[in-house]
Swiss-Prot record:
UniProt GO BP: regulation of translational termination
The entry's keywords: Cytoplasm, GTP-binding, Nucleotide-binding, Protein biosynthesis
The encoding gene: prfC
CDD domains linked to this entry: RF3 (cd04169), RF3_II (cd03689)
This protein's name: Peptide chain release factor 3
Amino acid sequence: MTLQEEIKKRRTFAIISHPDAGKTTITEQLLKFGGAIREAGTVKARKTGNFAKSDWMDIEKERGISVTSSVMQFDYAGKRVNILDTPGHEDFSEDTYRTLMAVDAAVMVIDSAKGIEAQTKKLFQVVKRRGIPVFTFINKLDRDGREPLDLLSELEEILGIASVPMNWPIGMGKNFQGLYDFTHGRVEVYQPEDGKRFVEFDENGEVPTSHPLTKNPFFTQALEDAELLLDAGNQFSEDEVVAGQLTPVFFGSALTSFGVETFLETFLEYAPEPHSHKTVDEEEIEPLNPDFSGFIFKIQANMDPRHRDRIAFVRIVSGEFERGMDVNLVRTGKKVKLSNVTQFMAESRENVENAVAGDIIGVYDTGTYQVGDTLTTGKLKKSFEPLPTFTPELFMRVQAKNVMKQKSFQKGIDQLVQEGAIQLYKSYTTGDIMLGAVGQLQFEVFKDRMEREYNSETIMTPMGSKTVRWIKEEDLDEKMSSSRNILARDRFDHPLFLFENEFAMRWFKDKYPDIELMEQFSV
């Protein structure tokens, strides 16, 4: 198979949602249909030890939440599928936002009873700004929920995107009968104990009149709704979908696996192939460019706690990866050999010999890489556009509970900070170690992982919220430190101030008008 044919097979997408909308459950079902797992583990099955495959950390298994992006790959219907299951919790939006830089499409999961929720709205705005196509799966049809027409209206009114249903529910909750699949010309009958059963349309494009469904009042109502939508609603346009202007909407129940395989088949038919990415010079690097290129969107420590390893996740943008190849690490200008490279099923992995544009590979990292790094070969020399960064809003002082375990404490901090979900600062005057995060849960996960993965108990002291501003090295003066600010350095050794509040920052500006305060560090 040629390189072009291989790249055309790739479908790389992220699943986004508000917490508890069923994102991890639908991920499990997709993996099951792809043959990657035999049985979908759900949050409900926690007592049996049958955990979600994509939730691989201990804390995820215990709490039933995803706190890190998982990468999973499988083949289905002639396509190579790369799924990135992202954290839904708002405290981990930084990891999610970076992950969205590595995909070509997004699947938005919505709880039929709750509609569009806060985190869904935030993530959709990121997807929209990037022009990523969005496919919507309205979940939990086996439970009582809101009217389907109201949910479609909400997509347009709250998210500002036109929608087109690809199927339509027949009843809901205890009256859920199935799905009217006008895309494929059939009815998918809901039989939770026996799986699904299809009723094909006749030559007139209708359910045969002899079938009992035609006398079912819920089916009659669904038929009327569907005909109204087909006549007066938006028409399906593949071009508008790929442009991110129209979202195809699918209904189903991930927990009972109903409607999920139909969704997968249709999604793979219309989801885009790998797309180009821009460099800092605005040059578009196409997937078919023969030179290899990719960028690191995530670093994860301890995917195998036995070996204290660290994996850098690379989205391949162009060309082909071959095991043992030398690449240029653009940030340093140095050559790096990619010899120990893996692909994933959550925490499970296997060595990979080849991968192409659109694939996600894991490179073992001994401290060489940073989130946002670009890897290239041949004539490609420029970095890709920078990944989004977030200024922390909450801060904690942290120290080792046992001073005799300072080495494991420092190793844990170094590795977990490198993942990018939590920021490290060191006081210029006292040497105190401070951590910054966008939400409280990040601190809880940090503390938990330090104990589990590095056997290092920590003492964490809240500092409240602070405002971070960087300064230039030549402006650094210890005398500028006061009771209203903390002079510190970040993990890259850049100088900065942690201001108590906006008033303290304005006071500083008035006293030192020539000092430039930067929201992000720039050279």
